[in-house]
Every structure is written in C-alpha cells, then in structure tokens.
Swiss-Prot record:
One record GO biological process: cell adhesion
Subcellular localization(s) per the UniProt record: Periplasm
InterPro entries with a match to the protein in the record: Ig-like_fold, PapD-like_sf, Periplasmic_pilus_chap, Pili_assmbl_chap_C_dom_sf, Pili_assmbl_chaperone_bac, Pili_assmbl_chaperone_C, Pili_assmbl_chaperone_CS, Pili_assmbl_chaperone_N
Matching Gene3D superfamilies: Immunoglobulins
One term of GO molecular function: protein folding chaperone
Gene Ontology CC: outer membrane-bounded periplasmic space
Provenance organism: Escherichia coli (strain K12)
Function: Part of the yadCKLM-htrE-yadVN fimbrial operon. Could contribute to adhesion to various surfaces in specific environmental niches.
Protein name: Probable fimbrial chaperone YadV
Pfam families: PapD_C (PF02753), PapD_N (PF00345)
Length: 246
C-alpha cells in the first residue's frame, strides 16, 4: 500500500482549497470539489500529470479523518482504478461510484473527501549511491458532496440563507452561524466590519441544518452596527459574495 511509506518517503499533505492549486505537486485534479448527484451511476474525476516524470498515483475516499489509512476506511464509494501510473504530460480518469453499502440521508447532503497520493519513481541506484535522498509523496484532498435528488432550494442560494448571531464569552468575540438548508456551505474567507475596521473571521464549513461558532480575530466583545462580509464557494469552485448585518 503506497500510503504506508514511512522510512524512505516523507509525506507532505497538501489540502486543495478553493482558489488555490496543487502546483507544488505534479498531479493536478480537475476541480476543487466533486458533486455526486444521487441519480448518477458514477462520476469521473480527471487527473493530469503536469510534471516531467511518470508517477504512481493512489486514489481513495475518506470520511474526514485525514490520518486514517485507506485500508481501514469504510465508505459507500469506490475509486477505480485505486492505483495507476500516469506518464509525464498525460492524464488518468478516476471513476467514482456510489455502492450504497451504507445508507446516506435523503433529506440533506453528505460529505466525503477524495484523496490523491502521488509517489515519485524510484531513483536510479547508481546515480544516488552514497548520497542522502529525500523523496516527497504529495497528497491532495478535495471534498465530495453526495447530493440526494429532490432537496429543497438551490445550493447556490444556501450561503445567503445563513443566519448570523453574536456569540462568545469573557470578552472574546465570536459568531454563531445557523444553516437552515439541506446543503453544506463552505467559505474561502470572511470578515466582520465594525467602526470602520475589518476583523478576520475563522470561517468553517457548515453542515446542513446545523450551527457553527466562528471566532472573530482582533475584536473584544460585541460591536454596534456590525456587518459580516464573506465569500462562499459554489459547485464550480467559484465565489458567492454575501453580507449580513448583526
């Protein structure tokens, strides 16, 4: 199993976020997220090797624990092929299929993570004789949202339906955010405007029909006439701008 490379390979975990790219790695995933609709038999994810060397690639899904080994994870999805070789400047399509081995909620989205681990080829023994060598295996993770058919509303409108409230204690400012929709809402950034200043918010993904508390950095206590500005992420990795008064 390529994931268990502890002695000769240093694993650098690279999380693929919106508006960023895994340019430090040679394998590039087409997109920043996967939307798997329940009426689809499968979804294809394209991988491209932008580097100059062939690479071995391992693909799998997890439930959110990025330290879990692929063999220990139980998810209702398969990734085919799980291991592949991608030559330089070539690509590979990974087929994701929902197996229904675990029943998922039908009234809301479910989230999983799609992983890609690229392992460089073994170096020529003669060229590296008597030399110290560090090989890096880069791992990229993006979210997979399983979306049941018939959910109410539109996922692009979910960020604008969020409810924002003051929270916090002992002089520390934070916000409680309620998501009344059946869709996950992810953010790229957010800040709070008060008294002519802006304070960064530690934004978090909010699950359907749930709350999250987000810290407001640099602000002590509540502020009058405050306004929240945020950028949420749509199905295509683009930005949805939103505002809310407190």
């Amino acid at each position: 199993m390529f994931f268990n490379t502890k002695h000769t390979t240093a694993l650098c975990f690279v999380t693929c976020m919106a508006f960023s790219s895994s340019s430090i790695a040679d394998i590039v995933i087409s997109g920043t997220r996967v939307i798997y609709k329940s009426d689809q038999k499968s979804v294809n994810v394209r991988l491209e090797n932008k580097g100059n060397n062939p690479l071995l690639v391992q693909s799998w899904l997890d439930t959110g624990d990025d330290n879990a080994e692929p063999g220990s994870i139980t998810v209702p999805f398969t990734a085919t092929p799980p291991v592949s070789r991608i030559d330089a400047k070539r690509g590979q399509t990974i087929k994701l299929m929902y197996t229904a081995s675990t029943s998922l909620p039908k009234d809301r989205e479910s989230v999983f993570w799609f992983n890609v681990l690229e392992v460089p080829p073994k170096p020529d023994a003669e060229k590296v004789a008597n030399q110290s060598l560090l090989q890096l295996a880069f791992r990229t993770r993006i979210k997979l949202f399983y979306r049941p058919d018939g959910l109410k509303g539109n996922p692009s409108e979910a960020p604008l339906a969020l409810k924002w409230f003051w929270s916090g204690s002992e002089g520390k400012a934070s916000l409680r955010v309620t998501n009344p929709t059946p869709y996950y809402v992810s953010f790229s950034s957010g800040d709070l405007e008060a008294s002519g200043k802006r304070y960064p918010i530690d934004v978090k993904m909010i699950a359907p029909f749930s709350d999250e508390v987000m810290k407001v950095n640099g602000l002590n206590g509540k502020a009058n006439s405050a306004k929240v500005h945020f950028y949420a992420i749509n199905d295509f990795g683009g930005a949805i701008e939103g505002n809310a008064r407190l």
